[in-house]
Amino acid sequence: MTNIRKTHPLMKILNDAFIDLPTPSNISSWWNFGSLLGLCLIMQILTGLFLAMHYTPDTSTAFSSVAHICRDVNYGWFIRYLHANGASMFFICLYAHIGRGLYYGSYMFQETWNIGVLLLLTVMATAFVGYVLPWGQMSFWGATVITNLLSAIPYIGTTLVEWIWGGFSVDKATLTRFFAFHFILPFIITALAAVHLLFLHETGSNNPTGIPSNMDMIPFHPYYTIKDILGALLLILTLLALTLFTPDLLGDPDNYTPANPLSTPAHIKPEWYFLFAYAILRSIPNKLGGVLALLLSILILIFIPMLQTSKQRSMMFRPFSQLLFWTLVADLLTLTWIGGQPVEHPYIIVGQLASILYFLLILVLMPTAGLIENKLLKW
């Protein structure tokens, strides 16, 4: 008799996705981040659900309800900090996952890649609206500054901003709708992640060499389930260390001050995982130009498959491209640092140079390196 997991309609789907899935035998730990993102998503939905049971999305009580969660709810402080730091872990895994895709040419699976870009945008939207909910100073002013960027859109900008606010400023209506968005978006992310996996399993996984591995596949279970469990344990260990020892390390002290529309914080900045984009936004001394650069800094990922000039898929055997890739990583770290600094002399020019280098690397230098490496193959 055939095993039930191969015959039952539901079990069969799970079996084909996580048990008998043919997987390249040589994928490295960089391929762990997909499953870690799944783990982060489940964890965020669960902690978020318990927080939503005690949170009130109203300007007069939101800040107090978060304080109430931390003080009066059993292990409320733990759930709250798991959720806040879980978002940071989510973005660390997300950026590592995208970096892996860029390095090894996984973007050549275009449907999977495009759904991935859509997932990134949705996760960023979720994190942004979520940051507004505690209704601290940085929540309020972050929401004001970022939503206000839409007013740069010609003709409809101002109307659009007031429509999103639900009034003439960030107020009760804004907070209520942001809570609604923050609740629904993770479920949309879950659905998109399922489609992401569906498209991936149409082609099978890429591998570090970028060479088709159809002749050398092994079953996902037990070989990669055990490897994923190790990754999951390391992720949980890091998250617990962060949550239990330094829960506020990645947060902003200003968010412990209740939102006050009459007092602007000295330095308005988003959470660390948006700082690179914020630095690109600030580096252009024009509102519309900055907004366009901000959008393009993320949407540029869609054009990556079209910018592939090399005959080789992966960067494994392409030293010039490797050098440029790690330069890009260093550039993004520089932008992240600049995004958190005040707008004054040395930082402004460094931010502008780093922003120019970001677009130059992706649009010009990397495709050129690919062409040069093609020439070198003939030597």
From Swiss-Prot:
Cofactor: record remark: Binds 2 heme b groups non-covalently.
Necessary cofactors: heme b
Topology term for the membrane: Multi-pass membrane protein
Residues reported to bind heme b b562: H83, H182
Record-level GO cellular component terms: mitochondrial inner membrane; respiratory chain complex III
Alphabetized GO MF terms: metal ion binding; ubiquinol-cytochrome-c reductase activity
Annotated residues for binding of a ubiquinone: H201
BP-aspect Gene Ontology terms: mitochondrial electron transport, ubiquinol to cytochrome c
Binding-site positions, heme b b566: H97, H196
Pfam short name (any one): Cytochrom_B_C
Chief location: mitochondrion
Entries under InterPro entries matching the protein: Cyt_b/b6_C, Cyt_b/b6_C_sf, Cyt_b/b6_N, Cytb/b6-like_sf, Cytochrome_b, Cytochrome_b_C_euk/bac, Cytochrome_b_N_euk/bac, Di-haem_cyt_TM
UniProtKB keywords: Electron transport, Heme, Iron, Membrane, Metal-binding, Mitochondrion, Mitochondrion inner membrane, Respiratory chain, Transmembrane, Transmembrane helix, Transport, Ubiquinone
Regions that span the bilayer: 33-53, 77-98, 113-133, 178-198, 226-246, 288-308, 320-340, 347-367
Coiled coil: none
Additional note from the record: Heme 1 (or BL or b562) is low-potential and absorbs at about 562 nm, and heme 2 (or BH or b566) is high-potential and absorbs at about 566 nm.
Similarity section: Belongs to the cytochrome b family.
Function: Component of the ubiquinol-cytochrome c reductase complex (complex III or cytochrome b-c1 complex) that is part of the mitochondrial respiratory chain. The b-c1 complex mediates electron transfer from ubiquinol to cytochrome c. Contributes to the generation of a proton gradient across the mitochondrial membrane that is then used for ATP synthesis.
Protein name: Cytochrome b
